[in-house]
Amino acid sequence: MDLTIVGSDNTLPVSDVVFGREFSEALVHQIVVAYRNTARSGTKAQKSRSQVSGTTKKSKKQKGGGARHGALTAPIFVGGGVAFAAKPRSFSQKVNRKQYRSAICSIFSELNRQGRLKVVDAFDVEVSKTKVFAEKIKSLEVVGSRLLIVSDGISECLSLSSRNLPCVDVRSVQALDPVALVGSDVVVLTVGAVKKIEEWLV
């Protein structure tokens, strides 16, 4: 299949495996959930009754005082420990490489099918000016959208001029992830990025 290059009459032949496969919602959902879970720090911690600082002496006599109680560090008391206290743990989920790559291909294919994928010859700016970068984006007619720009190489000027725009994310092919792709309204790829993506996924 061929993708039209924006601002040119030329087309770019691309692999059907990457940009023309069927969309698998279940697979993409699985990969996105796994990616987000793996990013969790998992540092939540609470103190159980054995970890709370306090005496373990019986708080009152056994008989004649209502309900029977022992130490005041029990979970039912204010300042006591937490029942079933949370401990630091890893939320990471194993994802097979083949599954991950299939999901990325599925996302690219669906973006292409919905007309949310644009290809440009190159995307670079000569000066570190947000105004210059914004004008370049305006020519793509995607103003007001959450925009992801994927380039085969990111220059310092491109990085500096884009970082002040809240709805624009500029990444290299190596920094791509499923959450960024799914969360973008429009994805802009340079010709060089398309070739690198095909090398990675095919």
Curated annotation (Swiss-Prot):
The keyword Glycoprotein does not apply. Belongs to the universal ribosomal protein uL4 family. Part of the 50S ribosomal subunit. One of its GO terms (cellular component) is ribosome. InterPro entries: Ribosomal_uL4, Ribosomal_uL4-like, Ribosomal_uL4_dom_sf. Residues 42-52 have a biased composition (Polar residues). Keywords: Ribonucleoprotein, Ribosomal protein, RNA-binding, rRNA-binding. GO terms for molecular function: rRNA binding; structural constituent of ribosome. Coiled coil: none annotated. One of the primary rRNA binding proteins, this protein initially binds near the 5'-end of the 23S rRNA. It is important during the early stages of 50S assembly. It makes multiple contacts with different domains of the 23S rRNA in the assembled 50S subunit and ribosome. Forms part of the polypeptide exit tunnel. The lineage of its organism: Bacteria, Pseudomonadati, Pseudomonadota, Gammaproteobacteria, Lysobacterales. Residues 42-70 are annotated as: Disordered. It comes from the Bacteria. GO terms for biological process: translation. SUPFAM superfamilies: Ribosomal protein L4. NCBIfam families: rplD_bact. This is Large ribosomal subunit protein uL4.
